[in-house]
Amino acid sequence: MVARLLLRSWSRGLAVGPGAPCRPLSTGFEPSQYLQRSIVPTMHYQDSLPRLPIPKLEDTIRRYLSAQKPLLDDSQFRKTEQLCKSFETGIGKELHEQLVTQDKQNKHTSYISGPWFDMYLTARDPVVLNFNPFISFNPDPKSEYNDQLTRATNMTVSAIRFLKTLRADLLEPEVFHLNPAKSDTDTFKRFIRFVPSFLSWYGAYLVNAYPLDMSQYYRLFNSTRLPRPHRDELFTDDKARHLLVLRKGHFYIFDVLDQDGNIVSASEIQAHLKYILSDNSPAPEFPLSYLTSENRDIWAELRQRLVSGGNEATLGKVDSAVFCLCLDDFPIRDFVHLSHSMLHGDGTNRWFDKSFNLIIAKDGTAAIHFEHAWGDGVAVLRFFNEVFKDSTQAPAITPQSQPASTDSSVAVQKLNFKLSDALKTGISAAKEKFDATVKSLTIDYIRFQRGGREFLKKQKLSPDSMAQLAFQMAFLRQYGQTVATYESCSTAAFKHGRTETIRPASIFTKTCSEAFVREPSKYSAGELQQMMAKCSTYHNQLTREAAMGQGFDRHLFALRYLAAARGISMPELFLDPAYRQINHNILSTSTLSSPAVNIGCFAPVVPDGFGIGYSVQDNWIGCNVSAYQSRNAREFLQCVEKALEDMFDALEGKMIKT
C-alpha cells in the first residue's frame, strides 16, 4: 500500500503543495526572491535515505519468467526457463555476488546509478525523439496572462525563484505524507529540522512520511549534455547568471541574476524579452541548433570544429546558461500540433542538449522539453508544478505592466558563430536527417469522456491498471498479438534511485484481452468484471514491487553491465532471443496527472513501436500516441477507445458490442 501511494505521489506527478508556513524572516531575506521558506532544509533527508535494494536473484528470475509467459509460445518459454535455471545456479549467481560486494563498497550511491548514466551517455542516437520527452503546461486560468511576453516573463521569474529557493536550501523537501495530519504540520517540521540529517529519514518514517531522493535537482539549472566521442559529458556551471533565449534560430543571452545573486527586476526581464521579440532579423541560413539533433559522435566532431574555429567562449555561454527559453513565432492549433511543436519543433529553435528548454508559443502555450540523461523527470516535475503555481498565483507582472526603461540593446547580447564550410555542410546534413525523421513521425490524441478515476475506483479497480489493460486490448485487436510493454516507475524512495520497469503485459491481461476482443459473447458481464479485477490486483502488485526496487529489469541490466565491464563472456540468458524481445518495447508508456499538466508525449523507443503518454483524470482519460510509419497511431487509438467502451459496458453490466 505504501509503495503504491508513493508511486502515485511522484510518478503520477501530483501537484506539489504550497510551501510550509515560513520561519520568522531573518534580516536580508526578500520574499519576492524566493518561492517559499521551508522550515526543514531542502536536503535534510538526503544523507539518511535508504539504499536501493538489490533483489534476490531467485526473485528476479521468477519475475522475469512471469513477464515472459504471455509473450512466448510453450517451446520458446521452456527454452528460456532452462536458460534461467542455468544462469541462476551458474554465472548469474557469481555475477550477483560480485554486484552485492560492489554495492557494499559504494554505500554513497545505488547499484544502478553508474550503469544507468553510462547507458544514456554512451548512446550514440540523437537525443531528440530517441530520449527527450516534453510536458506541456495548462493555460494560465486568467486568459489575459497567456500573452506570450507576459507568460514568458512570469515563468522566467518563477523559474529563477525556484533556482534561488533550491540553492538557499529553502525549498520544501520532496516528501510523500501517508498521514499528513501528523507529518505535514509545523509542529512535526520544527521537530524534524533538529534531528541530525543522518537520522532524519527515520524520524519521518515513524510518522508515515517518506522523503524522496533529490540528488537530481542540482542538474536542473546551468546544465548541458556535451557531445563527446563514445561517451557524452554532463556539464554544470552554477556560477553563470545569464538566460539563453532562442527565437527564429537566433541566440540571445542576458543576465537574470545580478552580481549579488538577486533576481533582475521583472520589468527589466520583460523589457529584454520584448526587445528580442521585436528583432526582425531573418532566420539564419545555417541554424546551429540542428547540430544538437545529430548522432552524438558526428555532433562531437562538429562541436570540436566549432571550438577550434573560434567559438569556444560563445558555446560556453550556451552551455552554462541557467536554462534555455524558446520563443516560437506561431500559435498552437490543437493537441497534435502542440505535441509536434514541443517534442521536436522544426529543429531551429531548440537546444536539445540543454537540461531543459522552456518553450512558449505565440499564444502563450508553454511546455518543458528535457534531456533525459541527467534525471528521470522527478526534479523536472516538481519544478514544473512549482513554476505553474507561482506564475499563475503570484505572477511577477500583469498584462498591464510596462517594461522597464532600460537599454536592452546593451543588456542583451546576440550570439554569433563563425561557421566554416565544413560546419555549414554538417548543419545541412543534420537538417536533412532531422526533417526526414520528423516527417516519418505521426502523433494522435483522444480524450475518452465516459468516465475516469472516480468511476474506476468505485468499481474497486486501479485506474492505471485499467488504462494499461486498454492498451493490451487495443494492440491485440489491431495486430493480433501480445507484445513487450514498458511502464516507467520511479524508485526515488531510495538514495540515487532512478527507475524500475512495470511490465503491464501479463497472463491476466492476455486472458482478459482475448476474452474481450476474440469472444466477448462467451462471457457474462460478471465474468469479465472478475477478469478485470484480477488484472488490477496483479498490476497493483507489480507497481508496489517496482516502487520498492523489486522489479527484474534493473537487476538484470546491472548483471549484464557487470559481465561486460569485467570482460566475461556474455551469459546465454542475455543472448536469448526472448531477452532481446522483451527489451524491444513495442508499447512504451508513461503517465502524468497534475493540475499543472495539459499533455505530454515522447516518441516510440523502437521503430515499430508506439510511444504512449496517458492520464487518467477524475472523469476522463486522455491518451497521446506517437508512431513511425510501420504503425498506425490513429487506428491504435480507435482500438483503445473501443477497449475502454467495452470495459465500461462490462462494468455497467451491459453486453459487449461486437
From Swiss-Prot:
Q: Where is the active site?
A: 372 (proton acceptor)
Ranges annotated as spanning the membrane: none
Q: What class of enzyme is it?
A: transferase
Q: Gene that codes for this?
A: CPT2
Name where it's found: Mitochondrion inner membrane
Q: Which SUPFAM superfamilies match?
A: CoA-dependent acyltransferases (SSF52777)
For this protein's source organism, the top of the classification is: Eukaryota, Metazoa, Chordata, Craniata, Vertebrata
The intramembrane regions are 179-208
Catalytic activity entry: (R)-carnitine + hexadecanoyl-CoA = O-hexadecanoyl-(R)-carnitine + CoA; octanoyl-CoA + (R)-carnitine = O-octanoyl-(R)-carnitine + CoA; decanoyl-CoA + (R)-carnitine = O-decanoyl-(R)-carnitine + CoA; dodecanoyl-CoA + (R)-carnitine = O-dodecanoyl-R-carnitine + CoA
**Which residues participate in (R)-carnitine binding?**
486, 488, 499
Q: Which UniProt keywords apply?
A: Acetylation, Acyltransferase, Fatty acid metabolism, Lipid metabolism, Membrane, Mitochondrion, Mitochondrion inner membrane, Transferase, Transit peptide, Transport
Primary residence: mitochondrion
Q: Where do the annotations place CoA binding?
A: 452-464
Q: What is this protein called?
A: Carnitine O-palmitoyltransferase 2, mitochondrial
Which terms does the UniProt entry file under GO BP? carnitine metabolic process; fatty acid beta-oxidation; long-chain fatty acid metabolic process
